[in-house]
Amino acid sequence: MKLNRTLVMWLVPILTASCVFGKDYQVRLEPSIMIPMRDGVKLSTDLYFPAEAKGQLPAVLLRTVYGKNKTFGWSGVHQLLVEQGYVVVIQDVRGRYESEGSYVVAEHRREDSYDTVDWLISQGWSNQKVGSAGCSYLGETQVILAAAKHPNHVAAVPMSAASGFYMPGRAWQSFSGGVFELAQTAGWFAASGSQLFYGPPAHIDRGQWFKTPQSRLFKMAPEVDFAAYLELLSTLPTHSLLERAQLPPSEYKSWITSAPDGKFFRNKDLAKPSDTFNVPSLFMDSWYDYGPAETIEMFKTFQRNAQSEQARNNQFLIIGPGTHCDYTESTDDAIVGARNLGDASLNYSALQLQWYDYWLKGKENAITEMPHIQYYVMGKNQWRNSEVWPLASTNYQKWYLSGKGKAQSRTGDGLLSLNLPDNDSRDSYVYDPADPVPSLGGHTCCTGSDTEAGGYDQSEIELRQDVLVYTSPVLIHGFEVTGELKAVLYVSSSALDTDFTVKLVDVYPTGEAYNIQEGAIRMRYRNSLSDSQLIEPGKIYQVEVALNVTSNYFAGGHKLRVEISSSNFPRWERNLNTGGNNYDETNWKTAQNTIYHSAIYPSHLVLPVIIESQ
């Protein structure tokens, strides 16, 4: 397949016509409309109307857990849509903020979203067409609405919505290889998981109260001292972290104590690979977000399981270089973490407006003529496009680990090459849960703390003796890596259970070592993410570590590097090495962990290298 390098040129005729939007309407708010669900529960909903607009209007629905009163101002596209003649509808989900009912994460969402669309199209102002919008949880609710298949839901733009799609062991992005996503999940439940119900006194009409200005002054989210968050995450046991912080009741404990692929997560109201879909969707995500691989799989599932040719032919995917919900406008100097990724300009608001215009207003424009897949190659700092995934020109290369047994730190002898090791060797290190390898950048969100996502220089971390470092010679020729990554390792441990972590790194000629992707495996889940099985100390096991997905150009003069250790904290919960439940324990053991590399035990990294047409 010849890679198309004219994407930016293709975007110009569409976006320049829409970069300066006329302001056709002012905004008129009808706040806190109580919309009834099929079981009688009412959900509080704000309707933002284009003032003075005549005739029937399309609606764009956002369903949020974060509070509808503040959602409208999160993105300029919401106001833009109203000004262009859309009714923007923002709803508190069941049990949150002004809405009635009990709040349980990932339940009642199909029926509630379906019933909300039913109510919208029953209104006299409706043109019978409803789109959906929003990022993160708001993207997730779009995916659930798509799975509900309401016939009047005609366009979706799920942004950073990977948590809405069930993949074994990655439900709600709470685990990686069986290792709990501690900072992200605890941080989210601390800020947004409260099950305390807010409401006015019984003698005051609920609907009328929420229409008063005074009601919008109340801050209903818990106060979280994130300045002390890292210290809190370091305490044990991990299943009672939020209780010790005296935060409101939430489902956090159920999350951390459930098997990564057990009944608890399987029964959650998430879109599943077996679901069918019938809504044209424009998926957006970022390489440094927590779930680009899940977003890609979701995109492919919407295509594969489409109920009509129209739906199948109108699934689109855009993946940029940023972090979670980082859809900034026309970024010509993209700094992601500390990594400069060049001119990643893309007018996301213009794309969304044209998407809704086509599907909800029937305006003829070129939006459906764009490539079905658009992705940003970091390092090369260029937009590319494709019609298939994996890319047709993918060549999976094995990069082997080798050395003479002293790969501890970047000053050691760990080597990464395309050649099988010519000697029988191994590298060992001591993993101490009391002194874990610190997280620095990476692929996470919602922590509320200083554990920010993105690309950062890992060279200081690579001086630790509990980090094995394998580095290639200086690359003579650069190459692009785009697609799913994995490491195949031969390992042993002195413990009954431990973790192994892997990080792919791009080493610049100036010495900076930027993280590209990372993954982990908890040894008890090496065979099944629903059934744990402890290991035999000293026995050698082959394990696969999924490193999600990326697109990065390793330029000539750079080096390819992989780090291996047993912790990445606080992103991932520390394994205490005891073989116990881990989440309810306060004692730990050190473990001697070993990576083997030889012709018999060929530990290696698998990279999807893109072969460019001459």
Write out the residue ranges for each language-model feature:
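C-terminal, loop-rich substrate-recognition/catalytic regions characterized by aromatic stacking residues
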Residues: 204, 208-240, 327, 333-614
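Short glycine-enriched nucleophile-adjacent loop
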Residues: 139-150
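Alpha/beta-hydrolase fold nucleophile elbow
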Residues: 125-137
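Accessory cap/linker subdomain of secreted extracellular hydrolases
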Residues: 75, 83, 147-149, 155-276
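Active-site-adjacent alpha-helix of alpha/beta-hydrolase-fold enzymes
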Residues: 293-315
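Cap/lid segment of the alpha/beta-hydrolase catalytic domain
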Residues: 51-122, 170-172, 178, 328-340, ...
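Short beta-strand/loop motif that positions the catalytic acidic residue
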Residues: 277, 283-285
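N-terminal cap/lid segment of alpha/beta-hydrolase-fold proteins
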Residues: 21-55, 471-477, 531
